[in-house]
Design a protein with these regions (language model features):
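Conserved SAM/SAH-binding beta-strand->alpha-helix loop
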Residues: 28
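SAM-dependent nucleic-acid methyltransferase catalytic core
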Residues: 39-166, 180, 187-191, 233
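Flexible, glycine-/basic-rich loop-and-beta segments that form/coincide
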Residues: 242-250
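Class I SAM-dependent methyltransferase core
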Residues: 5-7
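Short, small-residue-biased leader/transition segments that mark boundaries at the very start
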Residues: 1-2
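Conserved SAM-binding loop of SAM-dependent methyltransferases across substrates and taxa
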Residues: 10-21
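Conserved acidic-Pro-Pro-aromatic motif
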Residues: 146-234
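Short alpha-helix immediately C-terminal to the canonical SAM-binding loop
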Residues: 32
Length: 250
């Protein structure tokens, strides 16, 4: 069975499932480039990245030098090395870009950022059965067939109209795209391809996923821009399973 994820993100579902093959996509080209480099050049990558995880690099001056280098670099390998450093040393683990496509997360001021060497090797081993593509969710899902299962973990819909959200990439995910994702899922399940979507449990998401079988789980999430406020919120799992979905609205 082929597992397809149009929003691979950090890859936690990929790393904790056991399918024979994976097709994993994301709109963030830096992320996909890193994954492909870790997959193909594991030892070289780990050695280069380890050199940045030293006490001398854990200061604002060096961080901003590396951030500037990352934004100017055209070398995929060097960018991938710096991308991991910026993710670990940047504020709150954010991945954020300005409208010019420049990484703009400030320095995080952590005592000793963790170098994930064992996790990189585990990822590389698991990735031998995976293919990574930089593409939109629509393009990724368009290639799904009846040998696939599709899991979608999109940027979550706001919990309220005043919720403070920052763009994961320069292409922020709009409410129209959220609704479009649900329409694509409906089209796939009508072709006997199962789809699971996770999102916040709101009136809007319930409207979007009204043809799906809905399950509610409680998860602990940061609910402020500084990451300091955490509480349990309801998360919605919308399962589009052939033979189970509600009929389309007339």
């Amino acid at each position: 069975m082929l597992f397809r994820s149009p929003f691979v993100g950090a890859g936690s579902v990929f790393l904790n499932t056991d399918f024979s093959r994976y097709i994993l996509a994301d709109i963030n080209s830096d992320l996909i480039s890193l994954y492909n480099i870790v997959k193909m050049r594991t030892d070289e990558y780990v050695q280069a990245a380890r050199e940045l995880f030293v006490p001398e690099t854990n200061c604002a001056e060096v961080y901003y030098q590396f951030r500037e280098e990352f934004n100017k670099s055209q070398d995929p390998f060097r960018r991938a090395v710096l991308f991991l450093y910026l993710n670990r040393y940047g504020y709150n683990g954010l991945c954020r870009y300005n409208l010019r496509g420049e990484f703009n997360v400030p320095f995080g001021r952590y005592k000793k950022p963790y170098f994930p060497e064992a996790e990189l090797y585990h990822f590389a081993e698991k990735a031998q059965n995976a293919f990574f593509y930089c593409e939109s969710y629509a393009d990724s899902m368009a290639r799904a067939d009846d040998a696939s299962v599709v899991y979608c973990d999109p940027p979550y819909a706001p919990l309220s109209a005043t919720a403070n959200f920052t763009a994961y990439h320069t292409n922020s995910f709009t409410l129209e795209q959220q609704a479009h994702l649900a329409e694509i899922a409906e089209g796939l399940v009508d072709r006997h391809i199962p789809v699971l979507i996770s999102n916040h449990d709101t009136m809007l998401t319930r409207e979007w996923y009204q043809r799906a079988k809905l399950h509610v789980v409680k998860v602990r999430r940061s609910i402020s821009s500084n990451g300091g406020t955490r509480k349990k919120v309801d998360e919605l799992l919308a399962l589009y399973k052939p033979g189970v979905v509600s009929p389309a609205k007339k």
